[in-house]
A protein has these predicted regions:
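Catalytic cores of nucleotide-sugar-dependent glycosyltransferases that transfer UDP/GDP/TDP-activated
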Residues: 1-401
Length: 403
C-alpha cells in the first residue's frame, strides 16, 4: 500500500533539526515520523510530504527529497514549494495550501497514493482539497484543535479580535471543520478527545462524535528503542557532565521537558516548586529546554512569545536560585533526553507536566518508560493514562518524591 502523510507545517530531516525549539516542531513531528517508519518497516511505501524551504536560517529543508537511514527503501521525505522560499509559521500557511495541493498532484500525476493521512488542520485541509479532485480517501489526526486553544486564551483574558489576528483562528477552525467533515477516518488519542473536543460548539454540523465508526481511539505509544531503562554508551558519556552540575549527592530532581509555550504552563511547576521549597530541601528543579543552556544569554535568540515565557520564569525564580536549586539543561536529541531521564530516574526523581491542556500525553509516557515517576496535568490525554489522586501539583510532587 502507498500511504502519504500530509504535514505542511514544521519539517522533517534525519537529524530532527529544531525539534521542540519552535511551536511548529513539537511532538506532532515525532508522532508522524515514528508512525511513518513503522509503516515502512511493515512493507508499505510511505511518503512524508511537507514544505520546501530555501532559507539561510533553515538550511536543512532545501532539498526536494530526504530519507531516514534504515528505512530509505520504503520511506521518503518529499518537500514541495508553496508561498515562496522563506520559512513560514503555520499561521502564515493558510493562503498557500491550494498551491501546496497543486504541487502534490503535479508530482504524483497518474500514480496517486492509495491513501492520505493528514496531520493538523493544514494537513487536513490539504487532504480535503486532494480528495475533492482525486477521490483519494484520507484520515485526519488533529493533534490539537483550535477551539480548545481559543477557549483557554479567552479564559486567560485574551480578546477574540486580537487572538484571531495573531493565531488565525477563523482560518484554522474553518479548516478543521472541512477536515472533520470530509475525512474517512479521524484518529484521536483518548475518549476525552473524541467526546469533548470534537463536540465543541464551533464544530457543530461538521463533527458528530456519536458516529463512533468514523473515530478511531488510538492511545499514544512510546518508542522503546529510545525510551527505556537500559543504560547505553550515551548514558556513560553524559554522566560526567551531569555530575559536574548535580554532584554525586544523588539528590532527587523534578524534571520538566517542554518548549517555551504559555500553554505548557512551565511557570506553574516553577511556582509549585517554590511554594514547597522548604519541604524540598535538597531537591533540584531541572528544566530541559532545547537551545537553552545560559537562559539570560540564550533568551536573545528566542521569539517574542518565547522571551515572554522565559522572562516570567526567570523573574519568578530569581537570580540566586538559578544554578543552585534550579537548572536549565540544553538537551539536543531524543536519545540524549532518554539518557538524561535515566540519569535522574536513578536518583528517584519525577517528571512533571503541568500543561493547561495536553491532548497527547506522549512526554510523560516517554519519561515513565525511562524510569521517572510522572506527575501530569489532569486536563486531556494523561487523565486516561495515569491515575489522579492529588488535589494540587505541589502535593503530588512531594508525595511522589517521598515514595
Amino acid at each position: 500500500m502507498h500511504i502519504v502523510f500530509l504535514n505542511p507545517q514544521g519539517n522533517f530531516d534525519p537529524k530532527d533539526s529544531y525539534l521542540t525549539e519552535h511551536p511548529d516542531f513539537g511532538g506532532q513531528l515525532v508522532y508522524v515520523k515514528e508512525l511513518a517508519q513503522a509503516l515502512a518497516t511493515n512493507g508499505h511505501k510511505v511518503d512524508i510530504v511537507t514544505r520546501k524551504i530555501i532559507d539561510s536560517d533553515w538550511p536543512e529543508f532545501s532539498a526536494n527529497q530526504d530519507i531516514y537511514p534504515g528505512t530509505e527503501q520504503n520511506l521518503r521525505i518529499l518537500r514541495f514549494p508553496c508561498g515562496g522560499n522563506k520559512f513560514l509559521s503555520k499561521e502564515e500557511l493558510w493562503p498557500h495550501l491550494s498551491e501546496f495541493a497543486d504541487e502534490i498532484l503535479r508530482f504524483y500525476g497518474e500514480s496517486l497514493p492509495d491513501f492520505f493521512t493528514a496531520h493538523y488542520a493544514d494537513g487536513g485541509y490539504t487532504a480535503a482539497l486532494l480528495k475533492q479532485r482525486t477521490r483519494t480517501p484520507f484520515s485526519f489526526t488533529g493533534h490539537s484543535l483550535g477551539a480548545q486553544k481559543l477557549d483557554k486564551l479567552i479564559e486567560s483574558g485574551g480578546y477574540w479580535r486580537d487572538l484571531d489576528i495573531r493565531f488565525k483562528f477563523s482560518q484554522r477552525i474553518a479548516a478543521e471543520r472541512v477536515s472533520i467533515k470530509y475525512a474517512d477516518k479521524i484518529f484521536v488519542s483518548t475518549l476525552q478527545e473524541r467526546d469533548e473536543q470534537y463536540r465543541h460548539p464551533l464544530y457543530s454540523g461538521a463533527s458528530n462524535s456519536d458516529k463512533s465508526i468514523k473515530f478511531s481511539v488510538s492511545p499514544p505509544g512510546v518508542n522503546r528503542k529510545i525510551f527505556n531503562s537500559v543504560a547505553n554508551q550515551l548514558d556513560f558519556s553524559i554522566k560526567p557532565k551531569l555530575d559536574l552540575t548535580f554532584g554525586r549527592s544523588r539528590s532527587q530532581a523534578i524534571i520538566v521537558s517542554s518548549r517555551l509555550d504559555q500553554k505548557k504552563n512551565i511557570i506553574g511547576i516553577v511556582k509549585a516548586f517554590l511554594e514547597r521549597r522548604p519541604s524540598l530541601d535538597r531537591v533540584q528543579l531541572v528544566l530541559c529546554i532545547r537551545g537553552i543552556e545560559e537562559p539570560r544569554v540564550d533568551i536573545a535568540k528566542l521569539s517574542k512569545d518565547e522571551q515572554f515565557v522565559l522572562n516570567e520564569i526567570l523573574d519568578t525564580i530569581g537570580r540566586d536560585l538559578i544554578g543552585n536549586n534550579v537548572h536549565f539543561l540544553n538537551v539536543t536529541s531524543q536519545l540524549e533526553l532518554a539518557a538524561t531521564f535515566r540519569y535522574f530516574a536513578d536518583r528517584g526523581s519525577i517528571f512533571a507536566l503541568t500543561s493547561f491542556y495536553e491532548p497527547f500525553g506522549l512526554a510523560p509516557i516517554e519519561a515513565a518508560a525511562a524510569g521517572l515517576a510522572p506527575v501530569v496535568t489532569k486536563n486531556g490525554g494523561p487523565s486516561e493514562i495515569f491515575s489522579d489522586d492529588f488535589e494540587s501539583s505541589s502535593s503530588a510532587i512531594i508525595l511522589s518524591l517521598i515514595h
